[in-house]
């Protein structure tokens, strides 16, 4: 395959590089905890993402325990807009909250189909993400987001109850974070979800 040919060429090119490890794997199937020892205390990600796996790849990166300090991503423009979306917009969702919680995001440039060969049918974009200093990991955040956005048109209260919380516990959680009982997940800023995740620790 073309991917195997590229791998073989790069393997030969970097055969004598002592600080370089080349892996030929499906990223979505790769155990990132096994890769972590190769990366040191900090790492960066540079990727031209296949459009059809953009969301699962980005969610895996954003929820991993890897010490990712910076990312530079080329991806479909529509997917890029989800990183910078505002609460209440159609693009706003779990990926948005995770990215904005942990990273400062810059929309660098837009790329038209004419910049590629063969030409895709969609526009592309380049984003950079820089880890926000002092922001701690919240292991419960992905679970909170999965519950909160499970049914977008339902209230956060209903979604939390569907996830197994009693009405009393759900009400107490929302009150602690200053969230109205009738609020929907798509209308809340990332800080609200961070509060919920911290309260659930």
Model regions: which residues?
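Accessory (non-catalytic) regions of SAM-dependent nucleic-acid methyltransferases
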Residues: 197-200
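Short secondary-structure boundary/hinge segments and terminal tails
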Residues: 116, 191-192
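An accessory alpha-helical subdomain
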Residues: 125-129, 137-171, 177-180, 187, ...
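Catalytic cores of RNA-modifying enzymes
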Residues: 1-147, 175
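Residue-level marker of motif borders
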Residues: 71, 182-184
């Amino acid at each position: 395959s073309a991917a195997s040919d590229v791998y073989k060429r790069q393997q030969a090119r970097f055969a004598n590089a002592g600080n370089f490890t080349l892996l030929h794997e499906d990223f979505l199937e790769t155990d990132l905890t096994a890769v972590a020892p190769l990366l040191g205390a900090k790492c960066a990600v540079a990727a031209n993402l296949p459009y059809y796996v953009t969301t699962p790849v980005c969610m895996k990166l954003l929820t991993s325990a890897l010490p990712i300090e910076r990312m530079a991503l080329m991806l479909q423009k529509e997917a890029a807009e989800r990183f910078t979306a505002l609460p209440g917009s159609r693009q706003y969702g779990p990926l948005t909250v995770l990215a904005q919680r942990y990273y400062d995001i810059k929309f660098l440039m837009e790329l038209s189909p004419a910049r590629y060969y063969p030409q895709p049918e969609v526009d592309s974009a380049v984003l950079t993400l820089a880890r926000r200093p002092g922001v701690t990991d919240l292991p419960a955040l992905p679970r909170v987001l999965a519950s909160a956005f499970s049914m977008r048109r339902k209230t956060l209260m209903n979604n939390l109850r569907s996830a197994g919380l009693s009405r009393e516990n759900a009400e107490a959680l929302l009150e602690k974070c200053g969230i109205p009982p009738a609020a929907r997940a798509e209308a809340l800023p990332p800080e609200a979800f961070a509060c919920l995740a911290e309260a659930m620790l």
